[in-house]
């Protein structure tokens, strides 16, 4: 689903536009000028549905070069092993989330809690996957002609990242699950989730220019993206 030139929504579950598997997070693809990058990979139960959306949007799997992983919860990283094997792409994430993804242990990922709540079926298992490049909060790097800056998303997960992407004169903020539409946050009884962590990460986003707001679930915003960050900060008393 094309959002604007060089930016597509290629996966989304029941909490969003329901393009692919019911439990999938929002999966985005953007053109770097030297291949496409995915942001997150969905839950991995039917990852071919995301590949089908890519191809339906005219994006060849052979042109997908990167996967920016915001965090290693199952609905975001479960499809990563499939895409790495099929596309041969480079997985980029933080050191902490890379370790969680490589081990894929239910209790580390909060899957035991999520299964108990009924969010995941009991037989769900995320496939472990190795990251290829480790990045850190405060780091900026280039993918083709696109600049990517890393911001903390700690508070939702132990080492989660938001990615601020400068593309064609616009700034795109991929928040993972740190903030969703209208500044909502999600406090859960899973490792690394904390109110204080949310406060620190959201406060750090205060200086960022945000045109387009692209969360891991639910509605996104093609204009006035910074307002969603500001609403989160206001709700936390920042």
Locate the predicted segments by residue.
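Metallo-beta-lactamase
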Residues: 44-45, 140, 147-236
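Residues at alpha-helix caps and immediate loop-helix transition turns in enzyme cores, especially N-
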Residues: 22, 49, 79, 225-228
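Short, surface-exposed connector motifs at secondary-structure boundaries
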Residues: 33-36, 60-64, 144
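Residue-level marker for buried hydrophobic side chains located in beta-strands
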Residues: 37-39, 68, 91, 172-174, ...
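Conserved beta-strand hairpin/beta-sheet module of binuclear metal-dependent hydrolase folds
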Residues: 1-57, 162-176
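Active-site HxH/HxHxD metal-binding segment of metal-dependent hydrolases
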Residues: 45-48, 55-139, 231-234
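Short Pro/Gly-enriched beta-strand edge/turn motifs at strand-loop
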Residues: 7-15, 119-123, 144-148
């Amino acid at each position: 689903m094309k959002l604007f030139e060089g930016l597509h929504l290629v996966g989304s579950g029941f909490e969003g536009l329901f393009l692919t598997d019911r439990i999938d997070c929002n999966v985005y693809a953007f053109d770097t000028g030297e291949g496409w990058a995915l942001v997150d990979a969905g839950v991995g139960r039917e990852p071919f549905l995301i590949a089908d959306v890519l191809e339906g949007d005219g994006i060849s799997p052979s042109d997908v070069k990167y996967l920016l992983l915001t965090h290693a919860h199952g609905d975001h990283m479960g499809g990563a092993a499939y895409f790495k094997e099929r596309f041969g792409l480079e997985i980029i994430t933080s050191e902490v989330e890379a370790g969680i993804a490589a081990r894929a242990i239910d209790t580390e990922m909060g899957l035991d809690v999520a299964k108990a709540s009924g969010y995941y079926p009991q037989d769900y298992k995320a496939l472990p996957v190795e990251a290829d490049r480790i990045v850190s909060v405060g780091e900026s790097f280039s993918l083709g002609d696109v600049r990517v800056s890393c911001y903390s998303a700690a508070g939702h997960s132990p080492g989660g990242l938001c990615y601020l992407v400068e593309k064609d004169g616009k700034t795109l903020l991929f928040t993972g699950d740190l903030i969703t539409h209208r500044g909502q946050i999600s406090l859960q009884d899973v490792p690394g989730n904390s109110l204080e962590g949310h406060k620190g990460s959201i406060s750090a986003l205060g200086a960022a220019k945000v045109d387009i707001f692209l969360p891991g679930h639910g509605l996104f915003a093609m204009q006035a993206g910074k307002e969603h960050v500001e609403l989160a900060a206001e709700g936390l008393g920042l």
